[in-house]
Design a protein with these regions (language model features):
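Short helix-initiation/N-cap motifs at beta->coil->alpha
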Residues: 82-98
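Alpha-to-beta junction loops
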Residues: 97-107
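Conserved N-terminal structural module of periplasmic/extracytoplasmic solute-binding proteins
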Residues: 165, 255, 259, 266-284
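A structural supersecondary motif
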Residues: 129-141
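Periplasmic solute-binding protein
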Residues: 3-53, 145-159, 238-248
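Glycine-centered hinge/linker elements that transmit conformational signals in sensory
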Residues: 23-86, 136
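C-terminal lobe and pocket-closing loops
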Residues: 109-125, 140-245, 276-284
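Short amphipathic alpha-helical coupling segments at ligand-binding clamshell hinges
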Residues: 67-71, 165-177, 256-263
């Protein structure tokens, strides 16, 4: 009935950092996201991280976060296929299109193309889907105004330390794939929009009945409550690796969900403390 994944793998980390805790009610209300606490449980003061543990005003080991981990483990064990606990994100992603899954709670719009492919068990003969995207559910600690999910902002990054001429060339190239003509074609192929004009284009209105609610979602103001990873996270790679290792320990039963999140809180605070002492974050 339910599809998920639970293998000890980096993808288990973004299963949680991509806003699972916020759906349970971890993090503060309002936009921009994460003021003062975000979905990683990290609290900021004067735009600098001040801690993620409850004792430091954070939320990564608070009641909502522990509830979120418990609910994930319960659903994985009670409703997902037996093999799901040993799958990675990449292995679990194609399974719903095989037609044996009732819901997939952790859903990226990047899955839409395979789920809308004609001739698959999840698409009707007329090309309309047998499934529908639904608003993210939220847990008992959630309050109106909190975020309810994650979406990548799809930004381009140009490094200051790169060769100046190469950086200029990269900037020029970026103008092409983000141009209106190209971005609309990309939206039709990958179904991950970057422009409002693409979302509102008449060609997407024509395709909307075959995309299971994708177009309607992006035309709705509610999309603002699905936000990107905010600026509270000072070192994404270094902190992200802490998540999948600690979550995996709870999945296998090595530790309880509360212990897993307590350990994560301590490790995150330790890393952020080192970053603070190193003075690498600069001024606001």
């Amino acid at each position: 009935g339910h599809m998920d994944y639970g293998k000890k793998d980096p993808s288990l980390g973004w299963r949680f950092t991509d806003a699972w805790l916020s759906m349970a009610g971890a993090g503060d209300k309002g936009l921009p996201n994460g003021l003062p606490v975000d979905e990683w449980g990290i609290r900021v003061e004067d735009c600098h991280p001040a801690g993620s543990s409850v004792t430091r005003g954070g939320a990564v080991n608070g009641p909502a976060a522990v509830y979120a981990l418990n609910k994930y483990i319960d659903w994985l064990g009670d409703y997902a296929p037996p093999a799901a606990s040993g799958m990675t994100f990449g292995e679990a992603g194609p399974v719903p299109a095989q037609g044996q899954i009732a819901q997939q709670i952790f859903w990226y719009t990047a899955f839409t193309a395979s789920m809308a492919e004609e001739g698959t068990p999840v698409v009707n003969d007329d090309g309309t889907p047998k499934w529908r995207m639904a608003p993210s559910p939220h847990g008992p600690y959630w309050e109106d105004g909190m975020k309810v999910g994650y979406q990548d902002i799809g930004s381009w990054t140009f490094f200051e330390h790169a060769d100046p001429m190469q950086r200029k060339a990269a900037w020029l190239y970026a103008q092409f794939p983000t141009s209106k003509v190209v971005s609309l074609k990309q939206f039709h192929e990958g179904l991950t929009p970057i422009r409002q004009s693409d979302i509102m284009h008449e060609s997407m209105t024509e395709r909307a009945p075959k995309l299971g609610g994708l177009v309607e979602f992006y035309r709705s103001p509610d999309r603002e409550m699905w936000t990107d990873t905010g600026t509270n996270v000072p070192d994404y790679p270094r902190l992200a690796q802490l998540w999948w290792s600690n979550v995996a320990a709870a999945v296998t039963g090595e530790v309880s969900p509360q212990e897993a999140m307590d350990n994560l809180a301590q490790e995150q605070d330790r890393v952020m403390g080192r970053l603070h002492r190193a003075g690498v974050q600069g001024d606001c």
